[in-house]
Every structure is written in C-alpha cells, then in structure tokens.
C-alpha cells in the first residue's frame, strides 16, 4: 500500500485550510461592512458550496487551463497549474472556503457591536480592532469553521480530479486513490483507503471538539 496519497491529502488539506482561514475571515469582515451588493458578494463566495464539485473543477479548468489568459500567464512565469499539486490546493480552497466564510461571518455577526464602537472611540486602528478584538472574541466560531474547512478539504474529490487529475505521487489524494482502486477492481485497497480516511477524520473532529469543550469551560 503506497502511502503518498495520505501525505498528499494531509498537505493539501493543511495548505487549503491555512489559505481559507485568512481569506475566509477577511471576506466575512469585508462583506459585513459593504452596503451595496452585499447579497451578490455573499452569493458569489458561497456558490461553490452548492455547486457540484465537478462543475467547480470544470470552471477551474476554464479559468486556469493552458488556453486561458490566466493559465497562459502562469505558464509564462514557469508556474504550470493544471494537473499539479498546486491545482489540488486551489480546488480544495475553492470548495472549502465558503464554509470558513459562512462560519466566520456568523461568528462576527453575533459579537456585541458596542465593543467595536468603544474601541474606535479610544482611537484603536481598524487593523488592531480586527485582530485583537473581533477575531479573539469570535474564536469559537472561527475554530468551528476551521474544522469544517479542513474536513471538507480532506475529502475533496470532484473538483480535484477534474482540475488536478489523479497522478500517483503528485495529485493522487486518498479520495482519488479510492476511485482509482475501484476502477481497477481492487476493492481491498479501496476499503483500506476509505477506512483510513474515515478514521483520520473522526480522530481530527473528536480532538477539535474536545479542545473546544475544554476552552469553553
């Protein structure tokens, strides 16, 4: 049993969660503070959550493919994207970012606005208000978003196989390894990878739930 799909999955989910964390909380804060087109912005950010992952992967191919202007620009800089590990990260970010965004936005909306008003009257900058007041006070919701984001990225399949492919040792994650094993009629290998993915997800979620319960007590 080759272990590269496990490490590729772990690296991809970790990188995607890291990127989605900063993008998600920044977008949540920005959307809450725009007056015009807030509904449109919210819909665009949330859209990948409701679209079939294969559709997301197809549009990623259109945007970053070799024949697209953006894809060609990356190629000119010597940075190919399609069917590389970077593509697995991009696919995971696109499908998991809405979860981070929605939970972070919900956490920010529940905060007492008087705290922010008081900080502003004291002359505290918006940057410090965001990182020193809003994020720490919304930490439980943000951590919940991180858990959802990581587990979503961990099990990503449709967008990944469309945009990054299923290249062993490069883009083959546990999910795509299961698909490849079933296609090869190797159900024993598929079962091993499926069990590993379930167990890893359970351990991660249980550990994060225990940490959240301890931090609230």
Regions found by a protein language model. Give the residues of each.
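C-terminal transmembrane helix and the adjacent membrane-cytosol boundary/short C-terminal tail
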Residues: 37, 41, 98, 105-116, ...
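Cytoplasmic-entry segments and transmembrane alpha-helices of multi-pass inner-membrane transporters
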Residues: 27-62, 116
């Amino acid at each position: 049993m080759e272990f590269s799909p496990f490490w590729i999955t772990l690296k991809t989910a970790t990188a995607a969660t890291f990127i989605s964390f900063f993008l998600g909380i920044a977008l949540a804060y920005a959307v809450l503070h725009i007056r015009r087109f807030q509904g449109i912005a919210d819909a665009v950010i949330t859209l990948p959550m409701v679209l079939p992952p294969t559709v997301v992967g197809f549009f990623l191919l259109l945007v970053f493919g070799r024949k697209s202007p953006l894809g060609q620009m990356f190629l000119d800089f010597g940075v190919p994207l399609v069917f590389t590990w970077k593509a697995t990260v991009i696919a995971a970010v696109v499908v998991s970012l809405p979860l981070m965004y929605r939970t972070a936005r919900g956490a920010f909306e529940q905060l007492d606005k008087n705290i922010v008003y008081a900080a502003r009257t004291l002359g505290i900058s918006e940057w410090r208000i965001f990182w020193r007041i809003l994020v720490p006070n919304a930490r439980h919701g943000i951590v919940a978003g991180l858990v959802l984001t990581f587990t979503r990225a961990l099990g990503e399949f449709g967008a990944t196989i469309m945009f990054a492919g299923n290249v062993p040792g490069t883009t083959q994650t546990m999910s795509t390894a299961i698909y490849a094993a079933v296609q090869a009629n190797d159900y024993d290998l598929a079962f091993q990878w499926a069990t590993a993915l379930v167990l890893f997800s359970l351990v991660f979620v249980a550990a994060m739930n225990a940490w959240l319960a301890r931090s609230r007590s």
